[in-house]
């Protein structure tokens, strides 16, 4: 982004330039030692060295950007032009062209672990609905699409080193299904000590917590390096539909596919209207005549409240992205695919001490500014159904949705937005959630639910309107079988004894 720089003295610039030069040189030496530590065959070593080179490019850029302390010129941020954000209702009037499916491939981002929900292994293997995992639902959707239209849309999974082995093992069970599944690994970059700016790993086999997958902005490079990009283009695939593996609303949409082909756009980002729950979501802006993604991390502190104003920034990025594959190849080969760096601070434990480390990440939504004709499409909220917490899990397991060929369809009798559900720390892990809510309550008429403390729900419970259940420390609340709770607050202690 064209940005405003804070003025500095020449001596400050000279000092920072020298410091950056030393940091870059020390990093390069450390990475060379890291490469020499590997006892790999030639092909694997070349791949490892290529990853370290990519990381070094990112690290050097981080040093430059950090010392220039560039900030957005807030006054230059404009709402997107009408041609930069199109409403789904307009494009959905166009007829569908099923033959366009021969040009499509689908990719699910599958690098995340289920640790935030208390699960071991890839997040995609958490059971979501009627015995189906995230991965099962993705496979069922594409398989049904291929059967319905007699097409051959392939499914790609971008794994990380955290999920790759488990995923490779799991996808074998789909070998008899009508679907081609390919998986490849995204990069493995070294974490960096925050104080010394040196890499945490000292050898190829350093512990897992010394490394990190560098965000989904790494998608383009990893597609290219793995050979999958060229393979897709050779098959006549032109467009890649990318989405988060945990977004159950991200199904193939023929209307958006047709719109992309007819307009010749190289990149389409699906946006949806913000609610008060989405105030931190990245949004599309017009900046210096370019369409760009503005993330909350890029917003100056004094403008955060303005950024969260849902009247000024009305929609946000769902991370459902439609991307032209030949454009990706062109931009990678000309090294024109820089994305804003997101420095992510973490802590790791060494010798019983917590140590601050940095991981430098990028997001694929930020690449939008490099593609010709790139624009946003404002889609219905139904295309954004992420499962980040057990509160989300309750929603997607409920009678609010029914499962059709791997897709979740909203109950037509439901009126208004999805209910707002907030479950307390007792429900943070899937195991705790399943133990406390073994039978999902009926919530078609629910607006808001808050449950905190030692609470257990019985069978055939119905929740309507606003329901708040708060159990004090040291107590327990059992909601009896068959209860109907409507616009109530339940507090204190309620135990049902078996007779």
From Swiss-Prot:
Phosphothreonine modifications at: 19
Phosphoserine sites (modified residues): 17, 21, 79
Binding site for Mg(2+): 123, 246
Subunit text: Homooctamer.
Catalytic activity: alpha-D-glucose 1-phosphate + UTP + H(+) = UDP-alpha-D-glucose + diphosphate
Job description of the protein: Plays a central role as a glucosyl donor in cellular metabolic pathways.
Keyword presence, Metal-binding: yes
One Pfam family this sequence matches: UDPGP
A GO term from the CC aspect: cytoplasm
Molecular function terms from GO: metal ion binding; uridylyltransferase activity; UTP:glucose-1-phosphate uridylyltransferase activity
Binding sites annotated in the UniProt record for substrate: 111-112, 216, 244-246
Binding site for UTP: 109-112, 123, 186, 215, 246, 388
Keywords per UniProt: Acetylation, Magnesium, Metal-binding, Methylation, Nucleotidyltransferase, Phosphoprotein, Transferase
Family matches, as Gene3D superfamilies: Hexapeptide repeat proteins (2.160.10.10), Spore Coat Polysaccharide Biosynthesis Protein SpsA, Chain A (3.90.550.10)
Protein name as annotated: UTP--glucose-1-phosphate uridylyltransferase
Modified residues (N-acetylserine): 2
Record gene name: UGP1
């Amino acid at each position: 982004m064209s940005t405003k720089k804070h003025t500095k003295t020449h001596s400050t610039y000279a000092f920072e330039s020298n410091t950056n030069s030393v940091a870059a040189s020390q990093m390069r030496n450390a990475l060379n030692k890291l490469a020499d530590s590997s006892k790999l065959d030639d092909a694997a070593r070349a791949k490892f060295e290529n990853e370290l080179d990519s990381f070094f490019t990112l690290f050097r850029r981080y040093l430059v950007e950090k010392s220039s302390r560039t900030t957005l010129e807030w006054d230059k941020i404009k709402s997107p032009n009408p041609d930069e954000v199109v409403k789904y209702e307009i494009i959905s009037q166009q007829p569908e062209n099923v033959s366009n499916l021969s040009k499509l491939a689908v990719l699910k981002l599958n690098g995340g672990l289920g640790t935030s929900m208390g699960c071991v292994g890839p997040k995609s293997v958490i059971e979501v609905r009627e015995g189906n995992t995230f991965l099962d639902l993705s496979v069922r959707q594409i398989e049904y699409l291929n059967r319905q239209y007699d097409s051959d849309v392939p499914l790609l999974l971008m794994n990380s080193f955290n999920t790759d082995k488990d995923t490779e093992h799991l996808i074998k069970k789909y070998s008899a299904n009508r679907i081609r599944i390919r998986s490849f690994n995204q990069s493995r970059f070294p974490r960096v000590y925050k104080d010394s700016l040196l890499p945490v790993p000292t050898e190829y086999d350093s512990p897992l917590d010394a490394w990190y997958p560098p965000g989904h902005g790494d998608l383009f490079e990893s597609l290219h390096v793995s050979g999958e990009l060229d393979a897709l283009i050779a098959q006549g695939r032109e467009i890649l539909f990318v989405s988060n593996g945990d977004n159950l609303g991200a199904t193939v949409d023929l209307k958006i596919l047709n719109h992309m082909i007819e307009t010749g756009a190289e990149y389409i980002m699906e946006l949806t209207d913000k609610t008060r729950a989405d105030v931190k979501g990245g949004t599309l802006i017009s900046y210096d005549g370019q369409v760009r993604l503005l993330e909350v991390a890029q917003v100056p502190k004094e403008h955060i409240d303005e950024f969260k104003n849902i009247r000024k920034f009305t929609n946000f990025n769902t991370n459902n992205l439609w991307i032209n594959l030949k454009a990706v190849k062109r931009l990678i080969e000309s090294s024109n695919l820089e994305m804003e760096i997101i420095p992510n601070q973490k802590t790791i434990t060494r010798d019983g001490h917590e140590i601050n480390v940095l991981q430098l990440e990028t997001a694929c939504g930020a690449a939008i500014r490099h593609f010709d004709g790139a624009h946003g499409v404002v889609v219905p909220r139904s295309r954004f159904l992420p499962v980040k917490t057990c509160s989300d899990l309750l929603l997607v397991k409920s009678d609010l949705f029914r499962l059709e060929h791997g897709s979740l369809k909203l109950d037509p009798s439901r009126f208004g937005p999805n209910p707002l559900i907030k479950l307390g720390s007792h429900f943070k892990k899937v195991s705790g959630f399943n133990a406390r809510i073994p039978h999902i309550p009926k919530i078609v008429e629910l607006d808001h639910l808050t449950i905190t403390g030692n609470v257990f729900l019985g069978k055939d419970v119905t929740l309507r309107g606003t329901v708040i259940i708060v159990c004090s420390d040291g107590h327990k609340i059992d909601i009896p079988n068959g209860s109907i709770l409507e616009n109530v607050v339940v507090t204190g202690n309620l135990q049902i004894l078996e007779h």
